[in-house]
């Protein structure tokens, strides 16, 4: 049987994803367990983290396991990922050794590695994550690269709790771009689009212009998913029409893909769309929609204080669910 990783939810069946969510709910009610007793996980961070690191470390501990944190280039050697390269630069060891050696020590490996933001053609290959999965003899978990599947499941769990049902089919779901002074990763948006269409919601991707539409891979996944579920998917640049009648507003900022490596040119374009902020007037157009965001969030830039502090905001609950879904993921993979 092939080794199963958790790289993207699109790689898992709906029944497998539902089983993870069921287990996450069980862990939420019973915090401690022994599903990882005698097991260990290496958490490899190429980029900073607050929620991801704390929730993975605590999750492993609560299930009787042990987590170690490695930061290549800081407290561990810089790693080379190119094949066939003559390693005369700054990197000290190659991923083909790193992943294999870690696999001798631990039972799971988590990887967090953001895009370099210089060339999307390169970044979309997700080389760091896929290299770990290629060479590792143990399961690999995506802790955010160009997708963020752990956030996906925490998001869906929070929506299910809010609506009081595991069946989200037919909900009008708006994934809206929001302004940020910096160009950000598309990972959460890619994942939100994937899971919302996968679970049968009617999805609108709202963004300022065609330049801000997500990568064709995730658009294709969305179209494949709605073909399977009978739901709908559309791209919109009209704020009022997108918000009108929505049941879910999920906000995220990201940089325009055509401008990767040329952000100075993209900045004045992005600055024109500060009005995409999620505010009370836009939320008033919805069907009393629930609002969420993956966090961190710049208040009164991405969303107003009133929206963030309102009773329909579930961002904190979503973040809290990261602990439970990641415990479910670790437990499932460690049992192989």
From Swiss-Prot:
Listed GO MF terms: amino acid binding; N-acetylornithine carbamoyltransferase activity; ornithine carbamoyltransferase activity
GO cellular component: cytoplasm
Annotated carbamoyl phosphate binding sites: 49-52, 77, 112, 148-151, 294-295, 322
This protein's record includes keyword Transmembrane: no
InterPro entries: ArgF, Asp/Orn_carbamoyltranf_P-bd, Asp/Orn_carbamoylTrfase, Asp/Orn_carbamoylTrfase_sf, Asp_carbamoyltransf_Asp/Orn-bd
Transmembrane feature ranges: none
Binding site for N(2)-acetyl-L-ornithine: 144, 252, 295
Activity regulation statement: Carboxylation at Lys-302 increases the catalytic activity of the enzyme.
EC code(s) of this entry: 2.1.3.9
Keyword set, alphabetical order: Amino-acid biosynthesis, Arginine biosynthesis, Cytoplasm, Transferase
Subcellular location: Cytoplasm
Gene Ontology biological process terms in this record: arginine biosynthetic process via ornithine; citrulline biosynthetic process; L-arginine biosynthetic process
Residue numbers bearing the N6-carboxylysine modification: 302
Pfam families: OTCace (PF00185), OTCace_N (PF02729)
The protein's assembly and partners: Homotrimer.
Record protein name field: N-acetylornithine carbamoyltransferase
Lineage, top ranks: Bacteria, Pseudomonadati, Pseudomonadota, Gammaproteobacteria, Lysobacterales
């Amino acid at each position: 049987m092939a080794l199963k990783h958790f790289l993207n939810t699109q790689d898992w069946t709906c029944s497998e994803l539902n089983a993870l969510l069921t287990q996450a709910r069980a862990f939420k009610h019973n915090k401690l367990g022994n599903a990882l007793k005698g097991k260990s996980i290496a958490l490899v961070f190429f980029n900073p983290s607050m929620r991801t690191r704390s929730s993975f470390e605590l999750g492993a501990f609560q299930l009787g396991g042990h987590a170690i944190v490695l930061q290549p280039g800081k407290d561990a050697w810089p790693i080379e990922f190119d094949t066939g390269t003559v390693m005369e630069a700054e990197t000290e060891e190659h991923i083909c050794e790193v992943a294999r050696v870690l696999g001798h020590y631990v039972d799971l490996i988590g990887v967090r590695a953001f895009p370099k933001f210089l060339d999307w053609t390169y970044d979309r290959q997700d080389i760091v994550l896929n290299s770990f999965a290629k060479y590792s003899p143990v399961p690999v978990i995506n802790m955010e690269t160009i997708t963020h599947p752990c956030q996906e499941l925490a998001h869906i769990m929070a929506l299910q709790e809010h609506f009081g049902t595991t069946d989200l089919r037919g909900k009008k779901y708006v994934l809206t771009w929001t302004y940020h002074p910096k160009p950000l990763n598309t990972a959460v948006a890619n994942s939100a689009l994937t899971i919302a269409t996968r679970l049968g919601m009617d999805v609108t991707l709202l963004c300022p212009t065609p330049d801000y539409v997500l990568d064709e891979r995730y658009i294709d996944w969305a179209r494949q998913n709605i073909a399977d579920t009978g739901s709908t998917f559309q791209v919109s640049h009209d704020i009022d029409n997108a918000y009108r009648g929505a049941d879910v507003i999920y906000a995220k900022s990201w940089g325009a893909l055509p401008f990767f490596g040329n952000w100075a040119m993209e900045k004045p374009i992005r600055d024109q769309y500060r009005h995409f902020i999620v505010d009370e007037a836009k939320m008033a157009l919805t069907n009393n929609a629930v609002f969420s965001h993956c966090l961190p969030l710049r208040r009164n830039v991405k969303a107003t204080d009133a929206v963030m502090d309102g009773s329909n905001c579930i961002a904190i609950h979503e973040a809290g669910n990261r602990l439970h879904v990641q415990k479910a993921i670790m437990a499932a993979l460690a049992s192989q």
